[in-house]
Structures are given as C-alpha cells and as structure tokens.
Amino acid sequence: MSIFLTESDRVIVQGMTGSEGRKHTRRMLCAGTKVVAGVNPRKAGATVVFDVAPLGPGAEALGVRPGTVEVPVHGAVAEAGRATGAAVSAIFVPPAFAREAIIEAVDAGMRLIVVITEGIPVADAVYAHAYAAERGARIIGPNCPGVISPTRSNVGITPPDITGSGPVGLVSKSGTLTYQLMHELRDLGFTTCVGIGGDPVVGTSHIDALAAFEADPDTELVVMIGEIGGDAEERAAAYIRSSMTKPVVAYVAGFTAPEGRTMGHAGAIVSGSSGTARAKKAALEAAGAHVGRTPSETAALARDAHRKVVGAAERA
C-alpha cells in the first residue's frame, strides 16, 4: 500500500503552463502519474502536448509508452474536477497567488493539495491551512518536493527514477535529503516518501505521516528527517514514544549550524538552546528512535532496523 496517494488518483496541476509546472508535469506523466488537466484562467481551452517516455520503476506497468500526451487546460479547478474526476491538485503558482489557489482547490473538492511553491507569506499559509483543515482537505507543503509512492504515483518534483518500491516509509522536511536517503536506501525501497516542507507553517506534520505509516500494513519501518529550529521533532518524539510500534530511524540536519542564522529553510533557525540538532537527537533517542549523525549512517541504521524486523518475522 501507500499513504496519501494511490495509482488510481487523478491529478490536476495549477500553474501547469508555467515553466516549472510544465517541466514537472512532464516528469509526473513519465512516472505514470495520471495528470488529467491543468488550470490557468488565462489559457482556458488550450491543450499542452508533452513528449513522454517511461521514467522510473513501474512506469511501463502504469501504461507509460514513448510518445505524446495531450493535457487540457481549464479556467478553474472546479471545472477541471468536474470534467476529469480529479481529487488531487499540485500547485506551481507564484507565491502571491498561492493562498487563493489553495482556497480554490479546497472549494473544488480536492482532498489532497500538494503545494510546491516556495516563499508564501506566513499569514497566507496560516489562513490557507486553517481553511483546508476546516473542510477536510489535506495540504502537503508548501515549499516541499511533494509525495511519491514508487511504482504507483508521484505528485510534485521528486525524481521518480532514484529508488523503487519496498517496506520503508520516509517523511522529511528537506527535499535534497529526501532524495539522498531515497537513493541510499534504494536496495530496500519505499512505500511512500513524503516531503512535508521546511517552512514554519506546513499542512502535514511529521506526526501526520508517522500515524499514516503506523497504520499502513506494508510499511515496516519509518525514516524521519528533521532539521534545526522549532519543536516539530520534539513533538514527533513524544508521538513515537506513545504511539509507534514500528521502528523509527531519524536524521536531524544542522549539527554545525550557528545560533540565530536561518539555514536554508525559513523554519531552520536556532535560538539559544532551543531547536538545536543535539536537543532534537536526544529527544528522539529518548523516545526509542535510532538517530544517525550523517545521511549515510542513517541509511545504515535503517538497514539494521529492517534486518531486525525481518528476523523477528521469521522467528514468529
């Protein structure tokens, strides 16, 4: 199985006609994602033609063949949803328009909204997340790589050809570290990889993903990537202690970060002793998680945890 996303989900792309939207829509199509429409009020009625070829494991099984795919452009999300039956949206619009794009997707009945856009004002993000939560829609992001279930579907910008399917669940604040751990653990493979984003306000938390992986029968262990700043990792540690039965392996980026300086993401900032990588590592280890000091060490810990899971299953 997978979490949040299945191979049958139909996807629309808000901002598909822009350069980034067009580039990543093509990659999603090449991975086998069912992208069925784009949305741009100024280009309603147009059709965008994509050159596609299978990319990543499972693409051919999902029906991807070398050739072209035509994707229609609608003027509104509601119109696109009615015409295609889509319930998932990927958002590639500029930051100033992101709040209204999210609200439009929620009002149109999108159950999953993946917001790739970086630089959305915090007040806009707070409003949009509250609006979606009140209406039962899930936002992943903003400022995230999206969500991929290898050999099933891929919504966002995650490269589909760096890993395959397997028993590991991955939740991460960092896009590049998501890709690195996916590559380092390609021998095991993943049920789903969720990039939640590194902004101060995100729609899906570590805890949300941990709970979904705990409930997923095909996920045998979880790799969690955090970073300095805030208390998301400490809250995740409390959840791991109280609710996780599956092993959790973690990595916290930022052990050498200087105090008071934002490091990469808007939310990655240390203030005094609060939000340090060492404090987060200690909290996670106290909760029973195994924490690596580097991505490669984290991958090794994950392999060891998986061997123990397999050994326990064989002895049962």
What is the role of each PLM region?
Residues 1-316:
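Catalytic-core regions of core metabolic enzymes
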